[in-house]
Amino acid sequence: RYAERGMAAYFNDKFRLMAFGNANNVNDMGFGGGPRGGFGGLRQGLNASKMLGLNLNYNNNKTFQWDGSVRWNHSDGDAQTKVSSENFVATQGSYGNKISQTYTRSNSWDGRFRMEWTPDSMWNIMFRPTIQLTKSDGNTVKTSAAYNDDPYEYTDEPLDEEEISKLNEKGLMVNTQKSTSITYGDATKLGGMVQVNRKLGKKGRNITLRVDGDYDDKNSKSFSTQDIQYFQLVSALGGDSTYRAYRFNTTPTKSWDYSLQATYSEPIADRTYLQLSYKYKYSFTKSDRSTYDFSEMPAGTFGGITPEYRSWNSYLSLLQNPLEDYFDNDLSRYSEYKNYIQEIQLMLRMNRTKWRLNVGVMAQPQHSSYMQDYLGVHVD
């Protein structure tokens, strides 16, 4: 086990630089304060995380200053769960066993920058761009079973296939379930803000123009298998009843928004100002989930595959037909959401040595539109 931190810094009268890093495998996410696991709380299993960061700051103490930061985070997770339970209320399947194994990993980059320019006493210009890049992977294997009696009275390995067959011969088995999944996520987010402020001579009179914008591009994939066998239900063919679901999902999601704002402040008395502001914002989100259903394939088709990160081809190579032939329109989903917001504010501000008063009114007309295609139904 290890937990290491490091920091280095450089300063002069105009420029500051600080670099820091953290690496550990004791479930510490690298944030100060609170218990291990940071403000996100304790995490299960074995977790290793790494973090590198760089902060920069420049100020010429006259008209120009800027600061920026870049941060990289990496994490690996390994969590195994074993559960044995007894239900004192159920009349059937009152004993249960479950084991699951989950592996996760993620990489993320976060960059932020702020520039402020004051060419003279009347102007102030600010620019703030941001960028975030994230990739994450996961794979999970779960096995569970339900019994009519305590399986540990008969075996030490109640989830072993041979032992399940023996327990079934004794009439103790109710059902078994095996499921696997692999997931992948990729996200890119860009944002920016530009603000221009101009003083208009008289003390306290000024006008501010501001533009904000964000763009978010996400893509996720998942492949999941589920096999359930009911030992006490008879199928149409006279054997044990079974259920299976084999599905592959791809979900690209895009969203963007922008806002325009103008604010005017007028002094009407000593340390008393009347402020008028107008803001317009537009946002758009689009999600297009495509689901491919392979549940008609024979049971256990994918049973010999061990899930690994992004191992889509291990599953898709076993298909008998092109992937497009398995597209399920009912399980797929397409949606769009648009939002238009206007905001008008009129505010009175009073500043005194011992107290401050802000009072105002706001009107916010809003219009939204939503469209969806899901389960064969179009909603608009």
Regions found by a protein language model. Name each.
Residues 1-2, 14-380:
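Primarily recognizes Gram-negative and organellar outer-membrane beta-barrels
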